[in-house]
């Protein structure tokens, strides 16, 4: 191989190593927290919590958890 090819391989390898070494769990968790799916789940959770709080405050009858019907596969 000529020197230019070796130099390109070296730089690419260094970039890959830099990316692997910079990977941190905190950054990964931060990306998950900001994802669209997480935002939808948090919004749904807040909505359910508000509904539950309103039922408790207003003294509404507690609903029993319905037993799920057969699950489709």
From Swiss-Prot:
Subcellular location: Secreted; Target cell membrane
Tissue/organ expression: Expressed by the venom gland.
First and last residue of the signal peptide: 1-22
Cellular component annotations (GO), alphabetically ordered: extracellular region; membrane; other organism cell membrane
One function term, GO molecular function aspect: toxin activity
GO BP annotations listed: defense response to bacterium
Keyword tags: Antibiotic, Antimicrobial, Cleavage on pair of basic residues, Membrane, Secreted, Signal, Target cell membrane, Target membrane, Toxin
Function: Amphipathic peptide that displays potent antimicrobial activities against a range of Gram-positive and Gram-negative planktonic bacteria with MIC values in the range 5 uM to 10 uM. In more details, it is active on Listeria ivanovii (MIC=5 uM), Staphylococcus epidermidis (MIC=10 uM), Salmonella enterica (MIC=5 uM), Pseudomonas aeruginosa (ATCC 27853) (MIC=5 uM), Acinetobacter baumannii (MIC=5 uM), Klebsiella pneumoniae (MIC=5 uM), Escherichia coli (MIC=7.5 uM), Salmonella typhimurium (MIC=7.5 uM), Pseudomonas aeruginosa (ATCC 9027) (MIC=10 uM).
Note: ZXR-1 and ZXR-2 are two shortened peptides derived from mauriporin. ZXR-1 sequence consists of the 16 N-terminal residues (FKIGGFIKKLWRSKLA), while ZXR-2 has the additional residue difference K36L (FKIGGFIKKLWRSLLA). Both peptides display distinct anticancer modes of action. ZXR-1 could translocate into cells, target on the mitochondria and induce cell apoptosis, while ZXR-2 directly targets on the cell membranes and causes membrane lysis. The variance in their acting mechanisms might be due to the different amphipathicity and positive charge distribution.
Family note: Belongs to the non-disulfide-bridged peptide (NDBP) superfamily. Long chain multifunctional peptide (group 2) family.
Name assigned to this protein: Mauriporin
Source organism of this protein record: Androctonus mauritanicus (Fat-tailed scorpion)
